[in-house]
Amino acid sequence: MKISESQQLTNFDNSNGPIEIFADDGIEWHKNKSKYVALGNAKALSGTLSVESDKIEAFYKENDSSNMNITEVRAKRNVVVQDKKMKITGGEYAEYKILKDYFFINGKNITLTSEKNILKSNQKLEYWRSKNIAIATGKAEAKKDNEFVILADKLVWYLQERNQKTTVKKLLGFKNVSIKTNNEVAFSDKAIYNNETEICKLYGNVKLQRGESFLIGEYAEVDLRSGISKLLPAPGNKLNENKVRALIDKGGIDTDESNWYSLYCS
């Protein structure tokens, strides 16, 4: 059943607030499948949250009072998700689980932007809106305030709101991690960045590189505020069996530790 041409549909009885659905080419009611389908420039709106795409499907359940409660929204092609904290573009398919306040987005060029922070994926992005957590899987890339770029197979963002601004509280990287700053490149299996300390801890197969010189070990701490990096034996390795080592090119290594590395090894 086609409800209307270029009209809107207002939800019903939803615990997260009313949901309005708009479409240029009409809204269809598929009663047997308990869903509405919005076609052409479709948009679902709830408070500050909006989902836009070429096609939107809204699935609902009826309660004891025969009121309709939308439980899931699916968006297909040219997906854009936006609220006051962030904007997600580049999705080709998205699912929004309303009760969980959770997004699952597929696409080859997904970008989440929050203030000056950017998170990208060429495969999928998951976003827990109420928990302020985003996970990018694929060739994931994160940029923070133009301070550094981190690449990994999987990146986990923890966001926080402070002084009416949204910032990155913590960042985790898994598999094939690389961090690029203006002065150096660091590689590892895993990484944890803490915004409070501005220190990034690297774990497993660590390599700190500047030019043709690099340091190798199992654990490192990169201080993005001071520009000093520490290459250390792996935490908990009391016997220090995994020694750190440096490979230096013909030009030598810069001994100004404010610009280069503080090397700690016993």
Predicted regions and their residues:
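N-terminal amphipathic/hydrophobic interface segments
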Residues: 1-266
